[in-house]
Amino acid sequence: MTYRIKKWQKLSTITLLMAGVITLNGGEFRSVDKHQIAVADTNVQTPDYEKLRNTWLDVNYGYDKYDENNPDMKKKFDATEKEATNLLKEMKTESGRKYLWSGAETLETNSSHMTRTYRNIEKIAEAMRNPKTTLNTDENKKKVKDALEWLHKNAYGKEPDKKVKELSENFTKTTGKNTNLNWWDYEIGTPKSLTNTLILLNDQFSNEEKKKFTAPIKTFAPDSDKILSSVGKAELAKGGNLVDISKVKLLECIIEEDKDMMKKSIDSFNKVFTYVQDSATGKERNGFYKDGSYIDHQDVPYTGAYGVVLLEGISQMMPMIKETPFNDKTQNDTTLKSWIDDGFMPLIYKGEMMDLSRGRAISRENETSHSASATVMKSLLRLSDAMDDSTKAKYKKIVKSSVESDSSYKQNDYLNSYSDIDKMKSLMTDNSISKNGLTQQLKIYNDMDRVTYHNKDLDFAFGLSMTSKNVARYESINGENLKGWHTGAGMSYLYNSDVKHYHDNFWVTADMKRLSGTTTLDNEILKDTDDKKSSKTFVGGTKVDDQHASIGMDFENQDKTLTAKKSYFILNDKIVFLGTGIKSTDSSKNPVTTIENRKANGYTLYTDDKQTTNSDNQENNSVFLESTDTKKNIGYHFLNKPKITVKKESHTGKWKEINKSQKDTQKTDEYYEVTQKHSNSDNKYGYVLYPGLSKDVFKTKKDEVTVVKQEDDFHVVKDNESVWAGVNYSNSTQTFDINNTKVEVKAKGMFILKKKDDNTYECSFYNPESTNSASDIESKISMTGYSITNKNTSTSNESGVHFELTK
């Protein structure tokens, strides 16, 4: 059908829609699809709110996937039903009640009690939504509605403007402050449970009721990109907090069917996908860095805790956003892929998220390295459906490989929706999806002072946590992580086939003053201080490939009474530990370096090939911990025959001793502890770690590493594969020889020279205190008779300058 009209004729949008036409050239109109016109004529489509509610329910609960014949689903259903039944039974319903559940009585003066109460109602709603439940009765519906009404009048909805004033005044108090009032509960904790409940029981409430219940959110959390509004100190949210607050506002707008709020929420969420700037200070330091580091609370490496929360939040949000008219940020996928590849994957080994990235979460009994890794895998599986085909296949292989790498725990126990369980079952039974082989990977996170190394051939992973002016040695707030003193002060981690070593009560029963890799003071009295950073800036590392790295830490303890230069060299199948300049300003306390602090777990310990359990201050060339499984074996060759002390002893502890909110049940483990004492005349150490070797093979390794230089400010080692690795801690020029050819290191920095052929060395150099530019590398390092070629600078803060020395 074709129409011709005169130029003066006017056609309204409605006329066009009724006629089903659209303007073409020369004033001619042609018949087209009416819906296309509606889209073209309207700036933004109206969101399909029903579809969005269903998407949220599918991602987070998956009721339509429930199969009572699936044992994991039935287990979850029974647990959810039982908990909800008990909560309904225990709920206070009498008139004049002051609270709804015992244990959460002080709703107005303890905000966590308010959040816990709303969370209890959410748990009931979760059970009632399941079609197979026996709880979806008129009586229970009335109970839930009455409970929400009561809470609105007596807690979250009670004079919110007045409450903000009270919270703001309390927040600025220096004395007499109520520390039980937390902004998080008003802006994230409570509204998260409230909005979930209203979506779960959407058909039980009128639109007016739902809007009434969500109205306080606008007072406590008016903006989708800000936190601390409830305490009068609104600031831009970052990282996990930004995901959480934008998620709350997105759910609020779905409930209220508010398109403008939806756009703002999604715009706020999109701000998550940015990198922290190099010049950032204070809270601006929170978030992901280009080298994959994730910092929270300004100076704490937190990929394995807040980073995991962020990733899970993204996995909840992205499927929703893709169903809205505002899904136009395809670059988010690229950024997210980088975070997963560089940020998360190097920190996961055999279904375990390395504790060096979990901050104070290590002090929570039920929040383990396995549960953190399981959450990452669950998130990857969700995200795979929202990614391109190649990324989808990649993530599914990663998840399958991780789940099958450790049988000591059940991944499905950590899945909290039927759709997650269904996805996992489909993945694990899909023979077309293969597993990945073991990974050879070396990752240096210079922006959070962490290193991880995965050795493919020997099937082990090594981790290192350090401290500097930018990175705290540990975090202890809210009564958590009370003994984390040295966890970020040079502690080394060895992950092998003993998959339960760290997550099975290690942080409760280990001697926290004797952590492997650390140098501490004997009889040290440790105090909790606000600033847990070092004042040192020379901390970091460089790698030349995925097998060789040089790492250094200019070290001082918390009290600044102990200093040392501590170097760590990763050389393929071995890790070299070198220390010098170990000095205590307190003559009453001698320094001690802990070489090993390992659960005995079926190990037999040998010193110089002689079985022992205790040896006090004896000269030794080697220590070997032998297991019935060669992959679990751990060997140490000493480079200067030091006096070593070995102990085998039983340690007991309680989770409550490291986290006030945890249980006080006593736990017991046996440990082997290997230490070296220092003095003014014995102020250095040098040893080599060899994981996963038989005792006979270990013996053949005794001369593989040579100490070239072990001076106060200059460390260089050589291995028999023609690799030289070193650290220059001073600004002075230092020299060493390679086959009678002089190498000059003219500036501070970590460096590696790896022989490529008779005429060429592959090299890398990094100085954490300066800009690492390829243009002036000649002023940093040189080798007589060799010229520098093939210079390039890493695009991230990981590797420094790569170059070749060519004859």
UniProtKB/Swiss-Prot annotation:
Pfam family, one: Lyase_8_C
Protein location: Secreted
GO terms of molecular function: carbohydrate binding; hyaluronate lyase activity
S-S pairs: none
Active site: 241, 297, 306
Principal place of residence: secreted
Enzyme nomenclature, EC number: 4.2.2.1
UniProt record similarity statement: Belongs to the polysaccharide lyase 8 family.
Protein name stated in the entry: Hyaluronate lyase
Organism in which the protein naturally occurs: Staphylococcus aureus (strain NCTC 8325 / PS 47)
